[in-house]
Amino acid sequence: MAIGITACVLSLINYQGLAYSAALINEPIQACVIAREVDLTDDIRTKFAQCLGWQADQSSPVCLGFYKPITVTPLASPDEVRILADTASFYRTQRSTLSGHVEMQQGQRVVNAQTAYVYRDPKTNEVTKIEFLNHVRYLEPDRMMIARKAVVYPQDKSGEVEDVLYRFNTNRSNALLPAWGRASLIKRFANQDYFLKEATYTTCAPQDKAWAIEAESISIDNEKGKGIARNAKLRIHEWPVLYTPYLSFPTNRDRKSGFLMPIVGYSNVGGADLGIPYYWNMAPNYDMTLVPHLYTKRGLMLGGQFRYLTSKSTGTFNGNFLPKDKAFGRFLQDNEVEFPQIRGLSTNRWEVNFVDSTQFLSDLQLNVNFQQVSDDYYLQDFSTNLASVTQRQLLRQADLTYTTENWTFRGMGQSYQTLHPINEIPVSPVYERLPQLMARGYYDDLPFNANFNILGQYDQFHWPNDSWNIALNNMPQGPRFHLNPILSVPMMKPWGYVTPSVQFVENYYDISRNYTWGTSRANYNLTIPRYSLDGGLYFERDLHLKGTYYIQTLEPRLFYLRVPYYNQTLIPVYDSGFMIFNVDQLFRTNRFSGFDRIGDANQLSYALTTRWLEDESGAEKANFSIGQIKYFSERRVQLCQSPTGFCTDNPDTFGNLSSTFGTSPVASRAVYKFNPAWGITGDYIWDPATRATNNADLNLHYQPARNAIINGGYSYLVNGDVTQVRNNDTENNALHQAILSAAWPLSEKWSGIGAYSYNISKNYSMMSFLGVQYDSCCWAMRILGGRTFRSLNEEFEPRYNNNIYLQILLKGLGSVASSDPSGILNTYIPGYYDPFRRR
């Protein structure tokens, strides 16, 4: 029996779970049904933009528009099915027909069409399938599909659509717009997974042809947030540029297993290179990236990174291995006659790097930092960070720290791998500490407001075997015991303070030296007191400048230090050295670093500091400090070591100051913030003993926006430039070095980045890179060329490592990169936010 029902009557009928409501749809559903095999034209793209809800907006500078949000008001019951239509022909046992402005809603799923057919199970009379035809629009949260035909299965909420134009929202951190595309067929499974046949996929705006994936099929796993494209082509401006049988990409912020975009690039030391990274999301808190890497000049390298995060630990393991390096083999063959020390080196190149931090308990922590490379040239040949090419000391350290309310205990093992490239200035190895045991106590609640601080430390120093300099293999080594109790009584008032302090330094050494004829031993014990008196005053006044109210402070400070002289030249130098003199050194109790040299002192430091503080916020606008030390006696303790007990430090040693002049250099420091975007800092130290500048630095930082940055810096250090000269000798000269770096937008989408470091003393550049970056709505590109000083050649002319970095980021899909220059940019452009940085 056929029943023709008008919209008014339809609203009153409720039959077998189908609730019909007569809500006339005033706005027709905009359909964009075009067969999948039809190529896109500009007119079709314009039509698609309307169908997908695209709103052009020139005030949106990046994407030039936005999508209307997809909103669906859910029904009260998720199992309820509601159907609206202008007319219906209903059959109890046959197919029912709905016509005119048909709308079906089940939960948060809505389907619109001009015609619908309802199918029932002949036995149970339940609706098993609803078929929609003509101008079909399929909506659910974050999903829109416009199709020629759709079939919905209400019982398990699955369905499929044909000749589809779709829009799927993504939750990717770098995707600004939802994904959209076309497919000949889309299946929606009961678990909300999707299968797309003969499909395209892009996150560009509908009228933007920048990139798209065209695949035989695309599977989208909703729970895992992963998409897999099979037999896929990457099209750039509709031109096919890459084919891959398998491509995995994320559809949300979660990490996904799968192949990443290929790595491409070029360098003068490795040649052209190609890598195919595979990312393995092993668990929510474990992952691994494997990268087979082909270098045309060297061979095939296998690299990988393993990361983990547990309730107690976090860490990263990096490793690379390249067997039988062709270029390195030629290098060894060409140089082994002149440099016999490289004879027999393996051509297998490798690197391991392990960093771990484990919190066993709230007060017990383990830290590990280990790095090792196969040979002295590995970083020069393979480092992708221009700042690391000239690194010569690789740290290997593990420490276990236990902390209580008043004490800190630490056990540590530490050593370094020292790299010795040929025809470069030799670098001395660093003593190993195997182990170091430390205990530090601090009590600040003693009678008379006194503070007691005590440090006890045991170090077992071991000189590493160094085949490059046999003469150094009889270096002193052995244990050192250090004890340093300090008692101070700070007396604080709002207008100033006075802090008398007394302390003792106790060092004990058990020294051995290995010779060809045997081992020599010696013991040394040293007990030295230190007395100091520190005092300062606080003055302040109100200041009104250019419409802003400030508080200006004036803070004079005096610091008297008395340390008696003890001859220490018999004692080896394990970790002591001269320090660069600046404002911070005015109030130190020891002019040497480390514990092996306790400088004698009878001196008075005097300094003056002034600050400008904004009255409302308390933010510091500016500060300036200047000070000097008046010596009442000559400084007799020398850094040098001699078995005779007598030696004199070389006056040209870096950081060494006159030991006879009556005053120290004048140290000054200034910090000024012109506004929140513009600031300047600088140190200037003038030495009256030489009537010349001892050291200076000036740094400028301008950042009016997140990635609009200009940095400039200049450094000058007396004897800070060690130069290799003929006959393998070296000489110390003043270091003049300048650096300029910038990241600056050239337009809404284009920006430039670059840095340049120049050694004025030697008249050549140390590092430089320059690049341009394009950042649009759905993709970004960066090309960066750079070079860094590597070494001097036989004519003492600079040699460089040259690299070209190419990065292409397809937002919502992945990136193509020759390597990751994020380390370079973060090092040389402070404050820079890298949109390509992996997160």
From Swiss-Prot:
Protein name stated in the entry: LPS-assembly protein LptD
Assigned keywords, A-Z: Cell outer membrane, Membrane, Signal
Subcellular location: Cell outer membrane
Cysteine pairs bridged by disulfides in the record: none
InterPro entries xref list: LipoPS_assembly_LptD, LptD, LptD_C, OstA-like_N
One of the GO BP terms on file: Gram-negative-bacterium-type cell outer membrane assembly
Gene Ontology cellular component list: cell outer membrane; transporter complex
Cleaved signal peptide residues: 1-21
Biological role stated in the UniProt entry: Together with LptE, is involved in the assembly of lipopolysaccharide (LPS) at the surface of the outer membrane.
Family of this protein: Belongs to the LptD family.
Oligomeric form and interacting partners: Component of the lipopolysaccharide transport and assembly complex. Interacts with LptE and LptA.
Repeat found in the keyword field: no
A Pfam family that the UniProt record links to this protein: LptD
Primary location class: membrane
